[in-house]
């Protein structure tokens, strides 16, 4: 197990920003270095304790899916070794947890695909009979499989804020407003890119879910992010089908009517729900057993899905 990394301190490259989990550095005008830390957030608050190997799991799993799904849509990978773009004394910080990626313009939406009625979708369905405005058959139970996957985009929120579900029409409007000016002469436009993102996201989800089913895992839902290059070509960016962006259930314990256990930070959420805490920063420290169980769940998800061991 590698030494946990809460925050990278790369000095040889300019720091562009830090998200909930990832630190972003400029390599040059065309490329970025993405360092995936071991930070963990819950209820949109970054907690003070890192989860050992979490960043390595997320990076290895994303790389696995980028390779497996690359025939569906281009992705952000450059193939450049992250250790080659930092100083020699910084290589330990990036080893196994970093990617050198193309510098692309992100679409201003989260591309969420749902295959099951769970989470906020279950609450929405109970209240309205629909999820994000998409009408569904009556009488579905919690965690029921949908007749077919649905695309339910969300707005992108700043760190500490909540993403907001939006309609597909609103997603098209957002993409048109933010991207159309960048696409002059490219033969496409923002609204068309939103449609491309929807179609790509559903195709990615279906292929990944079919693969995962053969490994004994249900992918209940997932969130993709897309970006475009200067020619307006859509690329899969950020992370793909990790425990942070997806809801993974062990198939052998799945049944309708309950919220199944998942391969993610559920141990942390369950523990935090026992505290008198306002769910605002600063977050509380985690007990050692919660940290260990969460780390084990992340590693188990990677090993079961890929058939590989974390190097």
From Swiss-Prot:
Signal peptide: none annotated. It catalyses: 5-amino-1-(5-phospho-D-ribosyl)imidazole-4-carboxylate + L-aspartate + ATP = (2S)-2-[5-amino-1-(5-phospho-beta-D-ribosyl)imidazole-4-carboxamido]succinate + ADP + phosphate + 2 H(+). Keywords: ATP-binding, Ligase, Nucleotide-binding, Purine biosynthesis. Its EC number is 6.3.2.6. One of its GO terms (cellular component) is cytoplasm. The keyword Ligase applies. Pfam families: SAICAR_synt. Pathway: Purine metabolism; IMP biosynthesis via de novo pathway; 5-amino-1-(5-phospho-D-ribosyl)imidazole-4-carboxamide from 5-amino-1-(5-phospho-D-ribosyl)imidazole-4-carboxylate: step 1/2. CDD domains: SAICAR_synt_Sc (cd01414). GO terms for biological process: 'de novo' IMP biosynthetic process. GO terms for molecular function: ATP binding; phosphoribosylaminoimidazolesuccinocarboxamide synthase activity. Belongs to the SAICAR synthetase family. This is Phosphoribosylaminoimidazole-succinocarboxamide synthase. It comes from Aromatoleum aromaticum (strain DSM 19018 / LMG 30748 / EbN1). The gene is purC.
């Amino acid at each position: 197990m590698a030494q946990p990394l809460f925050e990278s301190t790369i000095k040889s490259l300019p720091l562009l920003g830090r998200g909930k989990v990832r630190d972003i550095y400029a390599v040059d005008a065309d490329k970025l270095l993405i360092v995936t830390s071991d930070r963990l957030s819950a209820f949109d608050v970054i907690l003070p304790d890192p989860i050992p190997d979490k960043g390595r799991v997320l990076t290895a799993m994303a790389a696995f899916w980028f390779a497996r799904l690359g025939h569906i849509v281009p992705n952000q990978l450059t193939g450049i070794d992250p250790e080659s773009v930092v100083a020699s004394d910084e290589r330990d910080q990036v080893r196994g947890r970093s990617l050198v990626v193309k510098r692309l313009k992100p679409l201003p939406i989260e591309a969420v695909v749902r295959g099951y009625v769970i989470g906020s979708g279950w609450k929405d369905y109970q209240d309205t009979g629909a999820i994000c405005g998409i009408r569904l058959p009556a009488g579905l139970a919690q965690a029921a499989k949908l007749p077919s996957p649905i695309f339910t985009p969300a707005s992108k929120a700043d760190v500490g804020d909540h993403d907001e579900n939006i309609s597909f029409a609103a997603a098209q409007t957002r993409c048109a407003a933010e991207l159309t000016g960048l696409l002059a002469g490219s033969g496409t436009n923002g609204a068309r890119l939103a449609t491309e993102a929807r179609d790509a996201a559903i195709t990615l989800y279906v292929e990944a879910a079919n693969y995962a089913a053969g490994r004994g895992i249900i992918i209940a839902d997932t969130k993709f992010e897309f970006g475009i290059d200067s020619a307006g070509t859509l690329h899969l960016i950020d992370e793909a089908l990790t425990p942070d962006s997806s809801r993974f259930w062990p198939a052998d314990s799945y049944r309708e009517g309950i919220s199944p256990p998942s391969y993610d930070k559920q141990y942390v959420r369950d523990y935090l729900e026992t505290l008198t805490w306002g769910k605002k920063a600063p977050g509380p420290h985690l007990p050692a057993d919660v940290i260990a169980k969460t780390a084990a769940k992340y590693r188990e998800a990677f090993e079961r899905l890929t058939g590989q061991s974390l190097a």
